[in-house]
Regions:
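Short beta-strand/loop motif that positions the catalytic acidic residue
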Residues: 180-181, 187-189, 193
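Alpha/beta-hydrolase active-site loop
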Residues: 73-94
Length: 263
């Protein structure tokens, strides 16, 4: 299926799998350079289908089968509208109460979900796998890994403004943690993540706990583990669903079961 965005000439490609009866829904958002048919969203979505949930997986703009305008991403600044469009389709078109809709994001998708969480106060529960807390910190880290001085991060901001007109550092996913209130967040981040260091997840967790109100909840999990992605290369980025498969399934079942009232 395709979603269209108001005031934007964009088509957002999505897959939907509806459960029988009045089941809660979960919206799944992929990472950078990925799409809805990647294991990072397909696997957890399949886990939740087996638990009786309805699910939507969508391709953010410039990814997968969705509209491609300039082959650029904006670190969630614009992509958050794709997430909100998917969420509103479930809420408004399918008539699902807000408290029965969860959102799941991985990597760039996790940061984007956090921005959407800040933008839309009706999003009831969100799972963030390997989120970035601040894009400037990510760019500085990538520059240092590549052997360049961190102050060049300002150039990335300028390039974003020049080519897309968007400040990719304008809003940070920390806004999502700060806006938690009486809502619910689960933050999972691998200790051996070399792409988005674990301190990003820890900062999101600390911030959410500081701003959480009485009826809200924050759960944080920092598993270890890496997988081989080549003859001589390993990665610890967003791999816990593979290295901790049974525990991942259990944690998702418990979190969404509790927060979306689906036991």
């Amino acid at each position: 299926m395709e979603l269209t965005l108001e005031n934007e000439a964009l088509r957002i490609s999505a897959w939907v799998r509806e459960a029988e009866g009045n089941a809660p829904w979960i919206l799944f958002i992929h990472g950078l350079g990925s799409c809805k048919n990647n294991h990072a969203v397909l696997l957890p979505a399949a886990m939740m289908v087996r638990q009786g949930y309805s699910v939507m997986l969508l391709d953010m703009r410039e990814h997968g089968a969705s509209s491609r305008i300039n082959q650029l991403h904006t670190a969630g600044q614009e992509e958050l509208h794709d997430v909100l469009n998917g969420w509103r389709w479930i809420h408004e078109k399918k008539g699902i109460p807000a408290e029965e809709i969860g959102v799941y994001g991985v990597s760039l998708g996790a940061g984007t979900v956090a921005l959407a969480f800040a933008e839309e106060p009706r999003i009831h529960a969100a799972w963030l796998d390997s989120p970035f807390a601040d894009m400037e910190k990510i760019i500085r880290s990538e520059l240092q890994i590549a052997g360049f001085p961190a102050f060049l991060a300002g150039g990335a901001k300028f390039a974003g403004l020049l080519f897309s007109g968007i400040d990719i550092m304008g809003r940070t996913p920390l806004e999502g943690a700060e806006s938690i209130g009486n809502r619910h967040l689960f933050i999972a981040h691998g200790k051996q993540d070399e792409r988005i260091p674990v301190f990003h997840g820890e900062l999101m967790c600390e911030t959410a706990n500081a701003f959480m109100l009485e009826d809200g909840s924050v759960e944080c999990w920092y598993p270890s583990g890496q997988v081989t992605v080549g003859e001589d290369k390993t990665t610890g980025h967003a791999v816990a669903m593979l290295t901790e498969l049974e525990e991942w399934n259990h944690q998702m079942k418990e979190f969404f079961g509790r927060t979306l009232n689906h036991q």
